[in-house]
Amino acid sequence: MKLYNKEEFLKLPSGTLFIFGPAYQEALLEPAIHSLNIKYESMTNDFVYKALVDIDADSSETLMDIDERAQKETRVNGISSNIPMDLECTTRDGFYEEKATYIVFDNEEIKAIIASLQTLVK
């Protein structure tokens, strides 16, 4: 993994696997708390990406309804019903944060992630 500043990250090609990194002033790299994302096109100080794991909701209201239902079910039953997953939707970063950083994975690391996930498939 390598940590990139925003200027260098925007130069990377479409199809780059990354997680959002810490801001410059933060002390720790904690990739375990962030989800994997795929970077697509870069724009001036912005970019398009897709989270590998996201909730399928067609609006903010629907997302809030799903969240509320899942949390209520978990409080009552200890587990929620299925939460719909979205594997297709892309979004713009849209924060224009100059000091943002990104942790980027190389091909060997991506292969290792895939191999690790394949051990879970039954």
Which residues does each predicted region cover?
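Mixed-charge, Lys/Arg-rich low-complexity intrinsically disordered regions
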Residues: 1-9
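Short, surface-exposed terminal/edge motifs of secreted or surface/virion proteins that either
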Residues: 24-47
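Low-complexity intrinsically disordered segments
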Residues: 44-122
